[in-house]
Curated annotation (Swiss-Prot):
Belongs to the SWEET sugar transporter family. GO terms for molecular function: sugar transmembrane transporter activity. It is found in: Cell membrane. Induction: Slightly induced by the powdery mildew fungus G.cichoracearum and the pathogenic bacteria P.syringae pv. tomato. Mediates both low-affinity uptake and efflux of sugar across the plasma membrane. May play roles in nurturing the male gametophyte. Residues 1-9, 67-72, 125-131, 187-190 are extracellular. Keywords: Cell membrane, Membrane, Repeat, Sugar transport, Transmembrane, Transmembrane helix, Transport. It is a multi-pass membrane protein. This is Bidirectional sugar transporter SWEET5. Residues 10-95, 133-217 form the MtN3/slv domain.
Length: 240
């Protein structure tokens, strides 16, 4: 019989694979931006936001904050690198006002993380205290980011069309949440459990909406418009 530690490691590896797939979801958008040499109507906001989310989760997984969380570090460290690449691509091909917006946002995020790290290491002296503070912050940021799928779901209901909500990405979001919920339960971690429990709920609602409105969808509309709407909603997120 597999012991809980081994089972947790296996589940965490599966979670890493699914989350990596979600982090890869924006690649077609980035390729299109690169070919056009312009960001067009695509927005950098979801990628800039995910940078902070990944930084926070990577810090959370460090042994002096939450011990035995290596798999949280690996996927969010990887995600952080990928999101920084995406943001860089936006910066290179964006207009001056958008570049200024990206620069200001990134500076604010770096300063915020520096303050969080300093306060955590200087004022909190146990992993229990540190994991509580960072864990709560991670939950808050994740809940805020779940507002993006709500925007897409509202659009689907309004238009009675699922072309703005790809099925496999919705399914992957659901599976990602479920896997990390299992991971959090094998060695109880409320800070991973809560946001991914909400992610699972969001995923299942997306799937129900997809099934409900699939038959009423007009698939002949402009695919490029669909991609812009979906990318700008910032739903392509993967996290622990």
């Amino acid at each position: 019989m597999t012991d809980p530690h081994t089972a947790r490691t296996i589940v965490g590896i599966v979670g890493n694979v699914i989350s990596f797939g979600l982090f890869c979801a924006p690649i077609p958008t980035m390729v299109k931006i690169w070919k056009m040499k312009s960001v067009s109507e695509f927005k950098p906001d979801p990628y800039v936001a995910t940078v902070l989310n990944c930084m926070m989760w990577t810090f959370y997984g460090l042994p002096f904050v939450q011990p035995d969380s290596l798999l949280v570090i690996t996927i969010n460290g990887t995600g952080l690198f990928m999101e920084l690449v995406y943001v860089t691509i936006f910066f290179v091909f964006a207009t001056s006002p958008v570049r200024r917006k990206i620069t200001i946002a990134m500076v604010i995020e770096v300063i915020f993380m520096a303050v969080v790290i300093f306060c955590t290491m200087y004022f909190l002296h146990t992993t229990k205290q540190r994991s509580m503070l960072i864990g709560i912050l991670c939950i808050v940021f994740n809940v805020i980011m779940y507002a993006a799928p709500l925007t897409v779901m509202k659009l689907v209901i309004k238009t009675k069309s699922v072309k703005y909500m790809p099925f496999f990405l919705s399914l992957a979001n659901f599976m990602n949440g479920v896997v990390w919920v299992i991971y959090a339960c094998l060695k109880f971690d409320p800070y991973i459990l809560i946001p991914n429990g909400l992610g699972s709920l969001s995923g299942i609602i997306q799937l129900i909406i997809y099934i409900t409105y699939y038959k009423t969808t007009n698939w002949n509309d402009d695919d490029e418009d669909k991609e812009k709407r979906y990318s700008n909603a910032g739903i392509e997120l993967g996290q622990a």
